Regions:
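Hydrophobic ligand-binding cavity/cleft-lining segments
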Residues: 2-100, 106
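Hydrophobic-ligand binding "helix-grip"
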Residues: 2-4, 100-152
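Solvent-exposed residues in well-ordered beta-strands and their adjoining turns
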Residues: 51-55, 92-94, 110-112, 141-143, ...
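Generic short beta-strand segments
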Residues: 86-94, 120-124, 159-160
C-alpha cells in the first residue's frame, strides 16, 4: 500500500498497489463500457476507539459541530458540504490489475440520541454514471471513562461497494478479483480511518478541549 500527496499522484504505480491522496477535481463519469458491465460486490467491517481527554458532554459538542472540523480533518481528501449534515468526500485514487478509480461518496452525519451518532451514505446526483455504488454505514457511541475526565468514542463501520470494471478485468478468475477487491477495500478503510481518527483527536485537543 502506498500513500501519496497530491504532488505524487502522477507517478506510476505497480499493479496491485493501493494509492491514496488528494485529487484535483471530482471524478468524472466512467465510459459506457464500464457503466453497463455487471457489478462485483466487495465488503469490509471495521471497528475502533478514539480517546479524548475531556468529559462526554464536551466531546459531544465537538461532534455536533462537525461543520467546523470535518473538512479540516479529512484533508488531503477533498470535501464539499451537502446540506446541513452531509458532505461529498473524494477519497483519492486506488486500483489494482492496472485499473484505477478516484471514488467519491456522499455521507451524512446525524445524532439520534445524546452521545450516539451515525454516518451513512447518501445519494449523489451522478451516482448512476460513476461505475460503482457505495453503502456506508457507521455508528459511534461516546462512553464515559475514568472520573468523567476521559471519553471513548467507540465506532463500527459496515462498508459495501458494488464496482463495475472494464471488460478485461472480467477475464481474470472471479475468486482472484473477489479476494483482491475485499483486501484492498479493507486496506483503504484502515488507512483512511487511522489517519482521520488521529487527526480528529489531535484537532479536538488543540482547538476544542478547553471550551
Amino acid at each position: 500500500m502506498k500513500l501519496e500527496s497530491s504532488a505524487e499522484l502522477s507517478q506510476t504505480t505497480a499493479p496491485g498497489e493501493v494509492f491514496l491522496g488528494a485529487v484535483s477535481d471530482f471524478t468524472s463519469a466512467v465510459p459506457m463500457e464500464v457503466a453497463t458491465n455487471p457489478a462485483i460486490a466487495f465488503s469490509t467491517v471495521n471497528q475502533g476507539k478514539l480517546t479524548f481527554n475531556a468529559p462526554p458532554e464536551v466531546v459531544a459538542r465537538y461532534f455536533d459541530d462537525h461543520q467546523g472540523w470535518f473538512a479540516r480533518c479529512a484533508a488531503p481528501m477533498q470535501v464539499q458540504p451537502m446540506g446541513q449534515n452531509g458532505y461529498t468526500l473524494v477519497i483519492g485514487r486506488f486500483g489494482s490489475f492496472g485499473y484505477e478509480v478516484e471514488p467519491k461518496v456522499g455521507l451524512e452525519m446525524k445524532s439520534h440520541l445524546p452521545g450516539m451518532y451515525t454516518i451513512e451514505s447518501i445519494p449523489l446526483p451522478e451516482d448512476g454514471e460513476l461505475g460503482y455504488e457505495v453503502d456506508f454505514r457507521s455508528t459511534m457511541q461516546l462512553v464515559e471513562g475514568h472520573n468523567n475526565t476521559v471519553t471513548y468514542a467507540e465506532w463500527k463501520l459496515d462498508l459495501k461497494a458494488n464496482v463495475r470494471f472494464p471488460q478485461f478485468i472480467y477475464t481474470l478468475p472471479k475468486g482472484l478479483i473477489q479476494k483482491t477487491g475485499d483486501r484492498l477495500l479493507n486496506q483503504i478503510v484502515k488507512q483512511v480511518s487511522h489517519r482521520l481518527n488521529q487527526k480528529v483527536v489531535d484537532d479536538f485537543h488543540q482547538n476544542y478541549s478547553t471550551q
